[in-house]
Amino acid sequence: MTPATIRPLQDTDRAAWLGLRQALWMGSDATTLAAEAGTLLSEPQRFGALFYHVLLALDGERAVGFVEVSLRDDVDGFGGRVVGYVEGVYVEPRHQRRGLGRALLDAATQWTRERGAPELTSDVLPDNPESLAFHERSGFRRIEHRASRGKQQTLLTRPTS
């Protein structure tokens, strides 16, 4: 386990966070990702989220990973119950396999629990077996396969208690 720090996003972290977002969603336009990030923080309801939160993993003063987590009442299979939802999680390749991703998910789970939601959920595309294995190692279990936005996905959940 690395001695990295996990903490909420601060205004001074925005450029680093945007760079990490672009690394995760490589096929996306940087301008679009930046605009989306601003809206996520100021108006999460526009993206269907009740609340939105970003946590960073820092190696010293440098951001090397993040998790974006929201509270949602529109996740399929949960009957309108509010659950935490991992919108994205990323750790720079050279910092992977040091426990940072798990620490980010643990912090997202704690944030979700503190807001009264019983579960943290996530989804993974079938062409990403590394992410599926990472989620399962981090305490998530598969609950269903579903189509969302024209793509098949595996929905996973992890209790917050």
Give the label of every model feature segment:
Residues 102, 114, 126-144:
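Conserved active-site alpha-helix within GNAT-family acetyltransferase domains
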Residues 3-5:
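Extreme N-terminal starter segment of soluble prokaryotic enzymes
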Residues 112-124:
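Conserved GNAT acetyl-CoA-binding A-motif
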Residues 74, 121-124, 136, 141-158:
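Conserved catalytic-core motifs of GNAT/GCN5-like acyltransferases
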Residues 8-15, 19-81, 85-88, 92, ...:
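Acetyl-CoA-dependent GNAT
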Residues 91, 97-110, 136-137:
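Conserved acetyl-CoA-binding loop-helix of GNAT-fold acetyltransferases
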Residues 105, 129, 152:
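Short glycine/proline-centered loop/turn elements that form peptide/ligand docking sites
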